[in-house]
Structure formats: structure tokens, C-alpha cells
Amino acid sequence: MALVIAHRTAGALAAENSLEGIERAAFCRADWVELDVRLSRDGELVLMHDESLNRTTSGCGLVGDLSLEELKCLKLRNRDGSLDQRSKVPTLKEAVSLARELKLGLVLEMKEEGLEGLVAESVSGEDCMVTSFYHASLRELSEISCLKTGIIISALPINPVRLALEAEACAIFPRRVNARLFKEAHQQGLAVYPWTVNSREEANWILRLGADGLVTDDPCLVRVAADQPAQATGKDNCPYYPCHHFPEQDCTHCFCPLYPCKDEELGSYVRTKKGKRFWSCINCTLVHLPQVAAYLAEHPGAITSELKARQRQKQNQ
């Protein structure tokens, strides 16, 4: 079963990065809880996502400009901006102690560079992973500790697996995914934990692709999907079955080797009812053409324009 990871200590259910959020994560049967860590002025590790205090607390200014004692005087804000009179800025030590008591694993994100030594001293164990956008920091952490690490990526780079291996990480935390990422990561022994998954529909889709876990603001919502065995998308309604490019596959992890191509001639941008714009490949048939698929099999590094040229050759014959 896939892991459920409570993002920012279940930020949809309590003030983010709070002890109350950790308790809510445990109530929802999350497996791990994700914490964001920054440094106070006097060198204490505290839970805080933003560099600024303005959005999530009753204070203002920068986290690093206040001492722990000053930070402890602040109240945390809920997602709607209201102050939670019970919640104060926790230290990493307090959060780790509570998570251990509630038998929750830890995903600790270093929000700043230079925290490697303090983090290595503060946490340990197989049920703990340290993540960061600062991949060099993860390499340094690996040199001084046995902690597991994971790279965070917000876009989908050309080779995220290589980035993870270069960072000496054992996991990838991507914001965008496709099935190729899961396939290549798993071939290298890397786990994949997409973020931030906040609907059952999205959870079901990502689990079908092969996710090892889901990072979510609402672990109660996602827990239901994660408890179910992943189901293959199937081929019953696929107009391209059997797929020319992958004739022996079972469609469980069907993917396009060109995604995300963002080619206006192959797909299109569509809008949701709420007005959001996203890329859709639903009208693309390029890699399902036999001559294109054959060329791609011989030239796996081919770019979209090369394949479109093959498509036009067939049309002109």
C-alpha cells in the first residue's frame, strides 16, 4: 500500500507546521508527517514554511530575525487566516517527540541551506527522511549521516532521476508526474512521492501510475484511496490498443515518451470550470502511428519535430 504523508502537518485540517496538525495527521491514519524547518536567530530549529512570519503567524518580519523565545510568543494562523489561540511555533525537537509518540514517520524539509549538521543531530531512524530543493545540501547531509534523503522538484526536468542520483537521494518528491518518471525511478530503486495531492480522483490516477506515497494537505481524504489496491486504467475504451510503441505492455503504466511536449499541433490547452488552464494530450495520436513508433523505437532520443516529419511523410505518400 502507498504511504500517506501529511503535508505541512496536515495543513488543511489545522494550522500548518503545528503540533495540532501532527495530532490530526495521526487521527487520519497518516503514515508520515512532513515538517518544514528553519533556523531562529539564536540557532534553534523551528517549524515554519515561509521565510516570513506574516502569512502563518500573528507576527511579521523574518523567522531568522527572532529568537526562539520571541517566536514562542506568536500564534499560528489557520488556512483561512484566522488565529489559532492554541497553536504556537513548535521546535523541531517538540515535533519529533510528538510524532514518535504517535508512531508517525517523519519527512523533514530543510527550507534553508546550512542546516545539515543540526538536522543530523536532531533526527535519526529508518522512518525519517530529509528533503530539500537544495540538492547540494542533501549530498552534504549524506556525507555526515545515514539519514535517507529525497529531492524536491516543482517542474518536471528532462532527467529527474539523474538529479536524484547526483544528489545521492533515495526518493523524488515531484510536483508534476508522468508514468515515465515512475518507471525510470523505480528501475533505479528510487521511491516517488508526488505533492500535493488533495482529491481522491487525483490520488487514484497517481496511484495507478505507481506512486510509492502521496503528499497531501488532507490525509483523511487521501487515506481512503491509498488503502485501495491500485487498479490498471485498462484498455477497454482505448482507441489505440494495441499500442504500436509498446506492443507487449498491459496498459497498466501507459505513457507518452514525449510528454510534456506542449506542442500546439498535437494537443491543446483547455480550461476547467473554474477557469484554470492546463495542457491536454487527449487529441494527440502521434506516437500511435506505426511509422512514427518504429522510428522512435530506433531513435529513443528523437525530438517531437523529427516525429512530426515522419507523420507528414506518411500523409504525403
PLM regions with names:
Residues 1-226:
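Phosphate-group recognition and catalysis centered on beta-loop-alpha active-site segments
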Residues 227-317:
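Cysteine-centered metal-binding/redox modules
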